[in-house]
Amino acid sequence: MVYRKPPDGGWGWVIVIVSFFTQFLCYGSPLAVGVLYLEWLDAFGEGKGKTAWVGSLANGIGLLASPVCSICVSSFGARPVAIFSGFMVAGGLMMSSFAPNIYFLYLSYGIVVGLGCGLLYNATVTITCQYFDKRRGLALGLISTGSSVGLFIYAALQRELIELYGLDGCLLIVGALSLNILACGSLMRPLESSDSPSPEKACTDKVPDQYFVYHEKEKTVEENISILEKGYIDEKCANNVPDYKQDNILNKNVLSSINVDEKDTYKKKVVEQTNFCKQLAKRKWQLYLNYWEETVVLFKNRVFSALFFAILLFDIGGFPPSLLMEDIARSANINEEDYHMPLVSIIGIMTAIGKLILGILADFKWVNTLYLYVLTLLMMGAALLAIPFARSYFTLAVLSGILGFLTGNWSIFPYVTTKTVGIEKLTHAYGILMFFAGLGNSLGPPIVGWFYDWTQEYDTAFYFSGFCVLLGGFLLLLAALPCWNACTDRSSKLPPNTYSYKVASSA
């Protein structure tokens, strides 16, 4: 479908508002799952690594399934997908209140809620991009803060609901709140299509009829013969021809000749259609090969390969604090009276601020977004290494704010990817990177939890997390150094026989 020119306003601002609240409602509980994590530890008595899988699946599976989610939005539209996904998120949260064990939560909270969030994310981004062109960056920045504000509010809300109604009541109420996604989704009116024919229809109109296996008006050979035979006999009976036997023989001869001709024509069409199917399959296979060739070309890019490792290591090491910070405070024996605000809420509000400030910095011409992203990775690695030394609420609150602000580097990640591979390859490269970002989100919290189960302390776990993020930052920094490009340019400009020529001349 061909959409008319994006209005950059009008109903588009309604789309921004409902997309903001959609991300607020769907991501609020999964991002603030650290509050629920403590209750699940007490309720089921499982290890921290096994319990952490619930939150990591809810936040990671949406990224892992992002290609499938994109196909669903492209096929059915943003509004139907948003409404359906609203039922998924609400149903998954409500089902989780009846969970008899941790494995049930893997399905209800981890997979169902996680997939619903992934579908909603793609729906909100797609419909926003359809309505905005010149102001697309501003619109996407506004809707992306919905998840961060949701993290800030839901952390305190879920804690209060648990104290009033228990864990099961909290999940039921949060699930009921998520039903408001249906109202938001119903307002995602698709952009009106233009009157001009779509490119797909224009292309298919030019294809000859013989290339369609089943033409609308085409009948089989047997049907054609039966129609001809019936029409010929009716005509002879109407004219009262006496020589029925002779005409019957003539009729059979005519029909046999028609039968042979139509069979030959049918065979030719079958051959043509078979060749067309072979060509179509060959073309699809060629597209598949081209995709993998382009993927290989992407990984030959030194900076892209480093960015691939950086985003994977960043999510393995940088995501666990938002899930485990509350348990870290409890393990440090910090009194609940000292809690002025949940640590997860601090992470959430600072993430929203970080997204806005880093996004503004990325728009300045004198700022290199790649080096800015590297700086956030190195600073986050240092902050993670400092967590084992924090023994008070104030220190953990400061570190939570720093980590939340630096996590806002998600807002500049598309800029970094574009700068690395170019706008032509952005979709392909960004899809690969998001898949492995989801893998890191899924693996990070369980790994940190297993470290705690092994050592009975979080110190080793966060030394590991800090090392992962620092390693990713240093790899990206080394790959992005301009000296590599200078060496490459110098070697490409040198003639192949320069060295032997100099030796011969000196001799």
From Swiss-Prot:
Disulfide bonds: none annotated. The keyword Transmembrane helix applies. It is a multi-pass membrane protein. Keywords: Cell membrane, Membrane, Transmembrane, Transmembrane helix. Residues 34-52, 101-102, 158-163, 324-340, 391-395, 452-460 are cytoplasmic. One of its GO terms (biological process) is creatine transmembrane transport. Its main location: membrane. It is found in: Cell membrane. The chain crosses the membrane at residues 13-33, 53-73, 80-100, 103-123, 137-157, 164-184, 303-323, 341-361, 370-390, 396-416, 431-451, 461-481. SUPFAM superfamilies: MFS general substrate transporter. InterPro entries: MCT9, MFS, MFS_dom, MFS_trans_sf, Proton-linked_MCT. It catalyses: creatine(in) = creatine(out); (R)-carnitine(in) = (R)-carnitine(out). PROSITE patterns: MFS. Pfam families: MFS_1. Residues 1-12, 74-79, 124-136, 185-302, 362-369, 417-430, 482-507 are extracellular. It comes from the Eukaryota. One of its GO terms (cellular component) is plasma membrane. GO terms for molecular function: carnitine transmembrane transporter activity; creatine transmembrane transporter activity; monocarboxylic acid transmembrane transporter activity. Belongs to the major facilitator superfamily. Monocarboxylate porter (TC 2.A.1.13) family. Extracellular pH-and Na(+)-sensitive low-affinity creatine transporter. Also functions as a pH-independent carnitine efflux transporter. This is Monocarboxylate transporter 9. It comes from Gallus gallus (Chicken). The gene is SLC16A9.
